[in-house]
Amino acid sequence: MKEGTGMVVRSSEITPERISNMRGGKGEVEMAHLLSKEAMHNKARLFARMKLPPGSSVGLHKHEGEFEIYYILLGEGVFHDNGKDVPIKAGDVCFTDSGESHSIENTGNTDLEFLAVIILL
């Protein structure tokens, strides 16, 4: 992609992948990569829509040299933020800075869906 050019990625072009026990978490997670690292000029390494069924989670992990943002689209759960458990729901934004650890768990009765973005420093 050249500087100044746009791009539209059609939903029909996106194939979600299923990951069991992501980062040591519980159950299965569905991840749909929306843009590649190259499309984001190597300034971000992830832009994805995540879906966690009830009881599923992304395990505790640490970010170094990057930060991660979650924007909660649907459902509810718990964001584990450096040892603190914070209830989350649709419309909330979760931020994890470089050097920090986090995980996310679906504690609700419906799917927890969110956008995940990892920006490189």
UniProtKB/Swiss-Prot annotation:
Residues 49-117 form the Cupin type-2 domain. Mn(2+) binds at residues 61, 63, 68, 102. GO terms for molecular function: identical protein binding; manganese ion binding; oxalate decarboxylase activity; protein homodimerization activity. The keyword Zinc does not apply. Homodimer. Pfam families: Cupin_2. Keywords: Manganese, Metal-binding. This is Oxalate-binding protein.
